[in-house]
Amino acid sequence: GIVDAQDCPSGGLEENGWANPCGLEKARPTVDEWQNQFDQEILDAARQTRVPSQLMKLIFAQESQFWPGAAMDAKIQEFGLGRLTELGADTVLLWNYAFYSQFCPLVLAESTCEYGYSYLDDEDQAMLRGALTLSVNADCSTCPSGIDLSGIDFSIRLFAQTLLANCEQTGYLVN
């Protein structure tokens, strides 16, 4: 593990695998350092998009506890600090045209992308959603702690763009 809690009872863990009070105490400095390492990227994304940085940080804390690795079970796959799903990818591609117009030509032919996400066939939409969700997957079997942080800035910017897309969709529905 990342934290050495061998001098704690049961190595710092309860029977269910959760940290015991001693394990929590040992982990606190590492946890604080881990979650605060993303502050500059969050601030940069906030400045670029006008999405409040505190909102993003609180959502990251709730959704992923600042762990950008994949969370997968039989029903759903979530990636990145914001836990992007295929439905979340669909939302940002459909409701944030500025983001779509930058991302789509990285995956599909520019001529295929020119009319917008809703005009793509189902196969091309699925390819874009898959490429987008996997682009924020930080899992790496050969990296320290199993996480590759080299793409974290894109993951954070994408999350801000996804929040903008959700606002756009909500505004459409309310009006």
Where are the regions that the model predicts?
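Cell-wall glycan-active module
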Residues: 1-175
